[in-house]
Amino acid sequence: VSQQGIGMTSQRTRERLIQRLMDQGITRFEVLEAIRSVPRHLFVDEALAHRSYEDTALPIGYGQTLSQPYVVARMSELALAKGRPKKVLELGSGSGYQTAILASLVDEICAIERIKPLVERARKQLRALRVRNVRLRHGDGLDGWGSEAPFDLILGAAAPEHLPTQLLEQLAPGGRLILPVGGERQQLMMVTATPEGYVEEAIEEVNFVPMLRGVSR
C-alpha cells in the first residue's frame, strides 16, 4: 500500500472518528482539532495501525493501553474547563498520544512514565511531530515531580486505589487534579485546590489500568 493510500484512508477514518466524538458530546473545537491533527497510528504497533482511528483502547505492550479517543477527548475538555492551563503534570504518558494532544492545548507539560521503553518511544514520536513544550521523565508517577511543582493541572491515565496526597500537594492554588481513582470500580475524579481545602467532584465511571508503584526498566 502506498503512503498516499494510507494517508487518504486515515484522513477519512479520522473524520469518522471526529464525527463519532461529536455524537458522544465532545464539543470543544480545539480538542477536536488536536485529535484530528495528531496521527494516532504513530503511537501504536504497526500491526494495529489499521485500527488507530477506531474509538477504542489499543494495547501498546508492557500491559499498557493507548486510551480510547473519547476518553482522551473528555480528559482534554476537562483540562480546559477553567481556561488554558500553563503548567501541566501528566502521569503515565505511555507511548505519548495524550501528551501530543495536550501539547497543543497547554503551555508546558512535564510527563512521567514508569516503563522505560515507553518513555523512549514517546520521546521519539514527540520529536518526530516537532512537539517542543514537553519534558518527559522515566519515574514513578505517584511521586509526582516535586522540583517542577506547583502545577495548574495534574492529569493521569492510570488509576491509583486512593487519591494520592503527595500529588495534591503539588497543585498550585486553584489548580486541579483529574485522575481515575479506585480498584475494580473507578471514578474519574476532579479535585480543585481552594483556599478552604481540596474540593472533590466525581465526573463519571471509567476503566483505566491501575497506577502501579515503582519504575520498570
Regions flagged by a language model, labelled:
Residues S2-L89, Y97-I101, L105, L118-R132, ...:
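Class I SAM-dependent transferase core
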Residues L80-V199:
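Conserved nucleotide-cofactor-binding alpha/beta core module
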